[in-house]
């Protein structure tokens, strides 16, 4: 199987960091994270809808995004949804998610995650330099790095103030360690 196909297969699923949150409740809340492949979303590669929810507020999904998995180089392009509210909760609603189209999304320049195989996992990182901004004119930038395995997804998402470099949001205690839920 090609690296592209392996990432596609491994990424799709439902993840939870409950074990981490129970072991380190001061630093982590229990979160469920979905990566749902959306057939035919883009003209090339594979499209994924991703969303997360705190297990304390299971009916309030947040951080909905769309990713496009591409090859040569192996990478994930990040997209924001033009109308977050319309798609909130769609990770658990296949019928609604089936209506998602590329024109419902807006690419986030500078937010590409470049993937590299490292033994039995893949690592993903953005180009350094603070180029990933969620909205034009943002005074802060985002940095994301992750490790993906067949049954794990460790991710460190952080926001920084552009002029000072001070971290403004995200984990200060390391990556969220998600394990794939087998149903």
UniProtKB/Swiss-Prot annotation:
One of its GO terms (molecular function) is lyase activity. InterPro entries: CpcT/CpeT, CpcT/CpeT_sf. Keywords: Lyase. Its EC number is 4.-.-.-. Coiled coil: none annotated. Belongs to the CpcT/CpeT biliprotein lyase family. Covalently attaches a chromophore to Cys residue(s) of phycobiliproteins. This is Chromophore lyase CpcT/CpeT 4.
């Amino acid at each position: 199987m090609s690296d592209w196909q392996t990432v596609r297969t491994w990424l799709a699923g439902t993840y939870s960091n409950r074990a981490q949150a129970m072991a380190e409740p001061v630093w982590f809340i229990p979160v469920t994270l979905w990566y749902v492949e959306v057939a035919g979303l883009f003209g090339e590669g594979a499209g994924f809808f991703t969303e997360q929810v705190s297990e304390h507020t299971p009916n309030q999904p947040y951080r909905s995004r769309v990713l496009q998995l591409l090859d040569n180089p192996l990478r994930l392009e990040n997209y924001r949804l033009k109308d977050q509210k319309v798609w909130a909760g769609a990770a658990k609603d296949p019928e609604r998610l089936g209506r998602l189209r590329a024109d419902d999304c807006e690419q986030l320049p500078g937010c590409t995650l470049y993937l590299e195989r490292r033994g039995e996992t893949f690592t993903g990182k953005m180009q350094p330099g603070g180029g990933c901004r969620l909205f034009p004119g943002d005074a802060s930038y985002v940095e994301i790095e992750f490790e993906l395995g067949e049954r794990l997804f460790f991710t460190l998402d952080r926001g920084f103030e552009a002029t000072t470099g001070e971290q403004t949001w995200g984990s200060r205690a390391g990556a969220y360690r998600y394990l794939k839920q087998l149903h």
